[in-house]
Amino acid sequence: MGRAKMASQIPPREIPEAPKVGMVSLGCPKALVDSERILTRLRADGYAMSADYAGADVVLVNTCGFLDSAKEESLSAIGEAIAENGRVIVTGCMGNEAEAIRAKFPQVLAVTGAHQYEAVVEAVHEAAPPSMGPYIDLIPQADPGDVKLTPRHYSYLKISEGCNHACAFCIIPSLRGKLASRRIDAVLREAEKLVAAGTKELLVISQDTSAYGVDVRHEERMWKGRPVRTHMTDLARELGQLRTPQGETPWVRLHYVYPYPHVDAVIPLMAEGLVTPYLDIPFQHASPNVLRAMKRPANEAKVLERIKAWREICPDLAIRSSFVVGFPGETQADFEYLLEWLEEAQLDRVGGFRFEPVAGAAANDLPDQVPEEIKEERYARLMEKTEAISAARLSAKVGRHIKVIVDEVGEPDEDGDIGATARSQADAPEIDGAVYLRNVPASLKPGDFAEVLVEDADAHDLYGVIADRQG
């Protein structure tokens, strides 16, 4: 009987290299969350992430299909991925137009619609099968952790899919379906996990945050041994109880909030410091005539009263909104009404859009389409008005101390001065302004909170110094 072969003589078994996936994520923060979920699932299945086209075995393009300009950007991204890599899977909102995509790019491997996670993962498995081995498959996998496409210190928290509104300019319900709320205990578990992992700012997103739980009749779920309703107010209150590992209260920022009556109950939570004093409310217009044509709530006068009441309860409240000019039927009087309303509302942050047709939207067939040159003129005046309001509101902060969260820290200049880019509670990442800091300590890092003395302001941004380093 021969001797057993020594372990050192057994040739090592070659472990197959994990296939790599590249990702291009376009569109809104909700699409970014979809991309994170897809990549998290793929990493759990043994895939690695590629930072460029060349190193990827397959490239995912998560598209946006809301506006024609967004579709053009999506098609351009698909074309670039095909040219640079050749093995491309398309998903996201524009995936609903599979025929159009395949007509332009017949070589795409697969096309799936918005938030069709299983279909995307299956397509990736077909295009680049995960590494399999007789030994690897028997080893329990550790939790790979969630893939994040945002900086470590802030995270988007998606609480629902879809929308029950039927706005004339929008096709979201046809792309993402009716409102479907996530279980509140699942949302809170995700938030708790994110904060424990280093998130300092939670950005609550959906198509209609105020409607959270309507589809499930605000059902109760147990959380920390007590019942909690699937409702925006309960969610905001519970998120306000979270603490970072350092004992800090993370910022909780509410986006896409329709001004339903129960929004009033959130304002005291902001005054108490449990929720960031910031509301992103998509007003879209102020003229009752235009709002009715848009199939939006037309109670702009009541909204002005509520904004005033909100600011009395929480003076630091910042309100962001977006407005569309040139909607079919918008008269000069309607537009002037909007400008007057904005002057009275004194919103802190405003995004403006020229109306553009969206395939499948009811507004395309409305009479009295506004000529492009008038749209441009109104858009320019809208931006001029809102920039003047913003400049005045920001200049009022000069000389005040405010709290900021740091996004980036620069390298020392020739004099050794280190600059940093931060945001105040009035600034959501990527869409609002910034607070630019001078002479920050070398120990400052992204995600840190700091007290800042505001020294200067312009129409969009603030400039300052850490409070204990002034002079």
UniProtKB/Swiss-Prot annotation:
Q: Does the keyword Nucleus apply?
A: no
Domain named Radical SAM core: which ranges? 149-392
Q: Where is the TRAM domain?
A: 395-468
EC numbers for this chain: 2.8.4.4
* Record-listed [4Fe-4S] cluster 2 binding positions: C163, C167, C170
Obligatory cofactor(s): [4Fe-4S] cluster
Offer one example of a GO biological process linked to this entry.
tRNA modification
Pfam families recorded for this chain? Answer: Radical_SAM, TRAM_2, UPF0004
This protein's GO cellular component annotations are:
cytosol
Q: Does the keyword Acetylation apply?
A: no
What is the reaction catalyzed? L-aspartate(89)-[ribosomal protein uS12]-hydrogen + (sulfur carrier)-SH + AH2 + 2 S-adenosyl-L-methionine = 3-methylsulfanyl-L-aspartate(89)-[ribosomal protein uS12]-hydrogen + (sulfur carrier)-H + 5'-deoxyadenosine + L-methionine + A + S-adenosyl-L-homocysteine + 2 H(+)
The family line of this record is:
Belongs to the methylthiotransferase family. RimO subfamily.
Q: Which named protein is this?
A: Ribosomal protein uS12 methylthiotransferase RimO
Q: Which organism is it from?
A: Novosphingobium aromaticivorans (strain ATCC 700278 / DSM 12444 / CCUG 56034 / CIP 105152 / NBRC 16084 / F199)
